[in-house]
Amino acid sequence: MLKTQKDKKLENNFSNNNKTKKKKNIIVGLSGGVDSSLSAALLVESGWDVEGLTLWLMKGQGSCCSEGLVDAAGLCEDLGINHKIIDSREIFEREVIKKTTEGYEKGFTPLPCSMCNKNVKFEEMLNYAINKKDFTHIATGHYARIKKSSYAETLDYKSFVFKDFLLLRGTDENKDQSYFLYSLSQEVLSRLVFPLGEMKKEETRKEALRLGLRTAQKPESQDLCLVEHYGSMQRFIDKHIEPKEGEIIHVNGKVLGTHNGIHHFTIGQRKGLGIAWPEPLYVKSLDRVKNIVYVADKSDLFNREAIISKVNWVSIEEPKQEIEVEAQIRYRSHPVKGTLIPMKNSDNPANTFKLIFEESQSSVTPGQAAVFYKGEILLGGGLIN
């Protein structure tokens, strides 16, 4: 029988990791959404021995019986596979809630999804698979892809030393989630499968309907899990950080008003400042020590360079000299050309680099991730200082 385009896409996704053809046992992370549901269903349809795994992340009333957990359990029953729930509330509290709170207190704008991926989600899944012993792979519903290093040999990227496994953007440019995965290790990539990596979002909905999945018509979540749980990021912040009054000052030195905590602001913010000025003003910087919010005209928001710390090199060995990259400094932003220069010396910790943009960029925000690409290959990424 001739293979359909869908079959070829799935084959591409399922054949990039070693030993895939010999051992077919896999743990699938299930959130109760359509993407993770379809990932599990496609793996079952393709002949894998699948077990669903859902992480119980949130503390509080009703969180143990959330809609996501119920849908994930029901899906596994429909597919005839086992479903396991792991209580990950303590590690999520420590690695995501606490660190996100600390980031806001320091005047940063943290990226909770990356924290969760690095220290909770994939670690918990991998440890569970390893402890089960007979499970060799893990899978999620992320829109991203993994290739072996031989893929890079077809490209003219001679300035890089590639690792065994490469992380790539998802085929669907509008849904690509590789930005949030820059902290993954080679150990994780060697066992990881992304069933949706070659698919478009509209295809996933059609496939879910074709397979009759109970989540096929479920609306797509647009928010962080923290936002879904607390109602808004503002409520999360108010619950975890005490108000502290300070001044809002124009970069020319004029005091324009007061605020109740720098944790309520982010670089480039315009709305909600509560100040009067003839022209629109934006948050330029946050001074944690003096508890000051500095504002300026939009033209003052541009920066030509940034310091990137805690860089993790996903697909290549750490460069010892400057390299040319395409840098993405926000999830929904387009990558921009830049030069990355190592800063390893007595004044800077290891894995710290200076990123010089080819053209100045607006609202380069401390706490967010700067992720480096070469074409569709994610090279690595770190935190904007």
UniProtKB/Swiss-Prot annotation:
It is found in: Cytoplasm. GO terms for biological process: tRNA wobble position uridine thiolation. The keyword NADP does not apply. ATP binds at residues 29-36, 55, 141. Keywords: ATP-binding, Cytoplasm, Disulfide bond, Nucleotide-binding, RNA-binding, Transferase, tRNA processing, tRNA-binding. The record marks 142, 368 as: Interaction with tRNA. Disulfide bonds join 116-225. The active site is at residues 116, 225. It is an enzyme of class 2 (transferase). InterPro entries: MnmA-like (IPR004506), MnmA-like_C (IPR046885), MnmA-like_central (IPR046884), MnmA-like_central_sf (IPR023382), Rossmann-like_a/b/a_fold (IPR014729). Residues 175-177, 330-331 are annotated as: Interaction with tRNA. Its EC number is 2.8.1.13. It comes from the Bacteria. GO terms for cellular component: cytoplasm. GO terms for molecular function: ATP binding; tRNA binding; tRNA-uridine 2-sulfurtransferase activity. It catalyses: S-sulfanyl-L-cysteinyl-[protein] + uridine(34) in tRNA + AH2 + ATP = 2-thiouridine(34) in tRNA + L-cysteinyl-[protein] + A + AMP + diphosphate + H(+). The keyword RNA-binding applies. Catalyzes the 2-thiolation of uridine at the wobble position (U34) of tRNA, leading to the formation of s(2)U34. NCBIfam families: PRK00143.1, trmU. Belongs to the MnmA/TRMU family. This is tRNA-specific 2-thiouridylase MnmA. It comes from Prochlorococcus marinus (strain MIT 9312). The gene is mnmA.
